[in-house]
């Protein structure tokens, strides 16, 4: 048990999926896991452990933003020995060829700042995914026939941005989408020699203004969860 996770050490699997939304964690566990049991509800941040095709997996909510994710990822790694951490969540599309409902598999995550920024000082550390997980996710996405993009994303530290020039530079440099957590997850995984990946569903588009209707989100997000689970145990 930690400050933010109330589970016993034996209740958390070595493979953890991390949606930001705790209700999405509950939905994913009920939909895709066998024998899912609630293992955490501290501060309403729900976590469940069950099995997927015989493999033990935990789905733990992480909240919004890098500071929140950093708390849960740190505790999962240091106190529960999590070895594989996969963020599953939504993002905003940034490139014209990236459409709402598409899935982005994040090869790298650019950020201006993160909870780890103070460690690097003048160094611009490049947070990247674990290659084996990345390759397995691409294979799983192709097998499902899911429209998928692989490349860099932008992890912002604000949701209501006041710097449109930053978005312009991200688009100019080929960034596929924007979210708020992956850069810190990749940094922590590198520091602790763990496997990490972010798989994201494009729920809205910054250029077109298109947004995914609420009734379509469940099925679209389901593709993302299945890709993550298949990649984790490939």
Swiss-Prot record:
Gene3D superfamilies xref list: Nucleoside phosphorylase domain
Gene that this sequence comes from: deoD
Function recorded in the entry: Catalyzes the reversible phosphorolytic breakdown of the N-glycosidic bond in the beta-(deoxy)ribonucleoside molecules, with the formation of the corresponding free purine bases and pentose-1-phosphate.
Family of the protein in this entry: Belongs to the PNP/UDP phosphorylase family.
Catalytic site positions: 204 (proton donor)
Family matches, as InterPro entries: DeoD-type (IPR004402), Nucleoside_phosphorylase_CS (IPR018016), Nucleoside_phosphorylase_d (IPR000845), Nucleoside_phosphorylase_sf (IPR035994)
Residue numbers binding phosphate: 20, 24, 43, 87-90
HAMAP family with a match to the protein in the record: Pur_nucleosid_phosp
Catalyzed reaction equations: a purine D-ribonucleoside + phosphate = a purine nucleobase + alpha-D-ribose 1-phosphate; a purine 2'-deoxy-D-ribonucleoside + phosphate = a purine nucleobase + 2-deoxy-alpha-D-ribose 1-phosphate
CDD domains noted in UniProt: PNP_EcPNPI-like
Subunit structure: Homohexamer; trimer of homodimers.
Recorded GO CC terms: cytosol
First-tier enzyme category under EC: transferase
Lineage, uppermost ranks: Bacteria, Pseudomonadati, Pseudomonadota, Alphaproteobacteria, Rhodobacterales
UniProt name for this protein: Purine nucleoside phosphorylase DeoD-type
Residues that bind a purine D-ribonucleoside: 4, 162, 179-181, 203-204
Pfam family membership, one: PNP_UDP_1
GO biological process: purine nucleoside catabolic process
PANTHER family tied to this protein: FI09636P-RELATED, URIDINE PHOSPHORYLASE
Annotated EC: 2.4.2.1
Site note Important for catalytic activity, residues: 217
One example GO MF annotation: purine-nucleoside phosphorylase activity
Keywords on record: Glycosyltransferase, Transferase
Keyword Methyltransferase part of the UniProt annotation: no
